[in-house]
């Protein structure tokens, strides 16, 4: 007589298990749906940060499941597939951290660890503030605006400032490059003629180098002329 225990669930047991945990499954799927659908930096920073945490957790979870699959493979083919997938997950996770750390060294912003993008926008205001924001790619043009004394860029709230605080150059950093944008146009004033209430700026991509933002911040006042 075999001492092995059959741990396979039949259909009825699966149905009973689903009935017992269906409320938890519903709540979990609803949570993921809300996070993935509404998790944008332009909508809600809180939900967006939750989305980043969920995405961060996926890689370790994938690696853990892959290791378990390697320990308990269904057959030889399954073992080979599990090893390949686990190695790929580990390399991808390590690659993410390498690129994020390189980007952090370049721009000194926690947005560097954003798993959705490998680029960070940065505006060094003339009043000493550094405003960093998430950006999905490196655009040809950036158009920050000031509305009611608040600076926005790419739809994200950055800081309270005045039109005179915007510098001549702003930056978009990637792990291996610093993209420099030069101000080419500036529009100030609303319909009432209030120049401090509303302003639009147009920055065009000027050049690319391998410098860091720290070298710009300590390089003198030429940045703001």
Curated annotation (Swiss-Prot):
Per UniProt, what is the name of the gene that codes for the protein in this document?
M
Protein name listed in UniProt: Membrane protein
| A GO molecular function held by the record | structural constituent of virion
Q: Which organism is it from?
A: Avian infectious bronchitis virus (strain M41) (IBV)
Q: Which residues lie on this side of the membrane: Virion surface?
A: 1-20, 73-77
Which parts pass through the membrane? 21-41, 52-72, 78-98
User: What does the UniProt function comment say about this protein?
Assistant: Component of the viral envelope that plays a central role in virus morphogenesis and assembly via its interactions with other viral proteins.
Q: HAMAP family recorded for this chain? A: GAMMA_CORONA_M (MF_04203)
Subunit description: Homomultimer. Interacts with envelope E protein in the budding compartment of the host cell, which is located between endoplasmic reticulum and the Golgi complex. Forms a complex with HE and S proteins. Interacts with nucleocapsid N protein. This interaction probably participates in RNA packaging into the virus.
State the InterPro entries in the record: GAMMA_CORONA_M, M_CoV
Which stretches are Intravirion in the membrane topology?
42-51, 99-225
| Membrane topology reported for the UniProt record | Multi-pass membrane protein
**According to its UniProt record, which protein family does this protein belong to?**
Belongs to the gammacoronaviruses M protein family.
State where it is primarily located: virion
- Alphabetically list the UniProt keywords: Glycoprotein, Host Golgi apparatus, Host membrane, Membrane, Transmembrane, Transmembrane helix, Viral envelope protein, Viral matrix protein, Virion
What does UniProt give as GO cellular component? host cell Golgi membrane; membrane; viral envelope; virion membrane
Identify the domain of life: Viruses
Places the protein is found:
Virion membrane; Host Golgi apparatus membrane
